[in-house]
């Protein structure tokens, strides 16, 4: 990777600005999953070991009005981070001004400060999300060097990543470095055979990824709601299954281009209702009843996909195989997750989002080589797009 990493910087006595991804799920003011905070620890701890002063900031949710601020403060994150680090994390409840500047000036080597949600700046003209140059310059003025460890927002050009990096020497944190290595590796130089498994509801969300991976992968296995648009493109009856009618022609084109590289399900678990209480059964993919909808892949498809995965050296998975949140239609996702987890000599990567949640829920997280922390960023990377948050980091 030709970008500077945090280990390339001299951090002793330095004020180190760190863009982390602390966009954690919250309920009633409490953090329900702290994975993203845990993922940032190696970078923060390294800065402290090097006697730097860690000045952390992140967004949390979307903030458009004063009312939106309710429940979007990073204060609970500071408390949790303090517990994880085993040391005080000074929280500053503002994003600019004398209080923040004074707190940073008083910071000693090896100390940590977290300031308020960067998107509080969006209330007045979307300064953070639109990468307001003055805001980027101001935040850059608060530190000596900048470390970007927020891969989750790398596909966005915001003041808190690109804006600061255009004004200050910058480097990738350890998490960002890992994401670039694994997700970038799939696109740029994978060990072969490379098998991609793509799920999720909509073809429209994954068109770019499918198109790019058809040029890179040896096989692309497709599951989830988007399979029915491909089936319709082949002239199959799909009953009441999810269909993006305006994408059928596009799906047809992808099928023609892909040949036998694209593998579709051979059966489906169907039901008359989108409900866990309704009766369900498995049918062949080409005989879905007119009054039923496909909500998961069946056992024959799980077996087929498991077979296609054998011998793979690199596997990337993004998106569930069915309606994972309803237990009757989660078996396909579980089956695929198990099949990937059982591969012994492959680099296995989950591209964030629902698939990452599925692997963690099932207790398989440690069986994968890498689970990405950025859903949208991973997808854009897999599409072959340049990510502004990565591109703006200083070159070595």
From Swiss-Prot:
It is an enzyme of class 2 (transferase). It comes from the Bacteria. Substrate binds at residues 21-23, 36, 59-62, 119, 156. One of its GO terms (cellular component) is cytosol. Its main location: cytoplasm. It is found in: Cytoplasm. SUPFAM superfamilies: Phosphoglycerate kinase (SSF53748). One of its GO terms (molecular function) is phosphoglycerate kinase activity. InterPro entries: Phosphoglycerate_kinase, Phosphoglycerate_kinase_CS, Phosphoglycerate_kinase_N, Phosphoglycerate_kinase_sf. ATP binds at residues 206, 294, 325, 352-355. One of its GO terms (biological process) is glycolytic process. It catalyses: (2R)-3-phosphoglycerate + ATP = (2R)-3-phospho-glyceroyl phosphate + ADP. Pathway: Carbohydrate degradation; glycolysis; pyruvate from D-glyceraldehyde 3-phosphate: step 2/5. Its EC number is 2.7.2.3. Coiled coil: none annotated. Keywords: ATP-binding, Cytoplasm, Glycolysis, Kinase, Nucleotide-binding, Transferase. It holds the Pfam family PGK. Monomer. Belongs to the phosphoglycerate kinase family. This is Phosphoglycerate kinase. The lineage of its organism: Bacteria, Bacillati, Bacillota, Bacilli, Bacillales.
């Amino acid at each position: 990777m030709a970008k500077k990493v945090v280990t390339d910087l001299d951090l002793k006595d330095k004020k180190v600005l760190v863009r982390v991804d602390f966009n954690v799920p919250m309920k009633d003011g409490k953090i329900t999953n702290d994975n993203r905070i845990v993922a940032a620890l190696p970078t923060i701890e390294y800065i402290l070991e090097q006697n730097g002063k860690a000045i952390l900031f992140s967004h949390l949710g979307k903030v458009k009005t004063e009312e939106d601020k309710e429940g979007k403060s990073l204060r609970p994150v500071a408390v949790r981070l303090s517990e994880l680090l085993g040391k005080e994390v000074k929280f500053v409840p503002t994003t600019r001004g004398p209080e923040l500047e004074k707190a940073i000036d008083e910071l000693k080597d090896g100390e940590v400060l977290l300031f308020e949600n960067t998107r509080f700046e969006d209330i007045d003209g979307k300064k953070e999300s639109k990468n307001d140059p003055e805001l980027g310059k101001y935040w850059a003025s608060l530190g000596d060097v900048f470390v970007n460890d927020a891969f989750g927002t790398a596909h966005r050009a915001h003041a808190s990543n690109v804006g600061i990096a255009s004004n200050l020497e910058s480097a990738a944190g350890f998490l960002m470095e890992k994401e670039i290595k694994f997700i970038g590796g799939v696109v740029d130089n994978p060990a072969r055979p490379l098998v991609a498994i793509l799920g999720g509801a909509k073809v429209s969300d994954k068109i770019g990824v499918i198109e790019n991976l058809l040029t890179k992968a040896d096989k692309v296995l497709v599951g989830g709601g988007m399979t029915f648009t491909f089936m319709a493109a082949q002239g199959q009856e799909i009953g009441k299954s999810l269909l993006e009618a305006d994408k059928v022609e596009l799906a047809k084109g992808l099928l023609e281009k892909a040949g036998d590289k694209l593998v579709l399900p051979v059966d489906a678990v169907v039901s008359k209702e989108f409900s866990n209480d309704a009766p369900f059964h498995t049918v062949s993919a080409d005989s879905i009843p007119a009054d039923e909808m496909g909500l998961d892949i069946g056992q024959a498809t799980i077996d087929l996909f498991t077979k296609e995965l054998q011998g793979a050296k690199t596997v990337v998975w993004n998106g569930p195989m069915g309606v994972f949140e309803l237990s009757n239609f989660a078996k396909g996702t579980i089956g695929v997750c198990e099949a990937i987890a059982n591969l012994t000599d492959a680099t296995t990567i989950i591209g964030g989002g629902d698939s990452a949640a599925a692997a963690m829920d099932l207790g398989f997280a440690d069986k994968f080589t890498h689970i990405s922390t950025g859903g949208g960023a991973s997808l854009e990377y897999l599409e072959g797009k340049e990510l502004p948050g990565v591109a703006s980091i200083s070159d070595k």
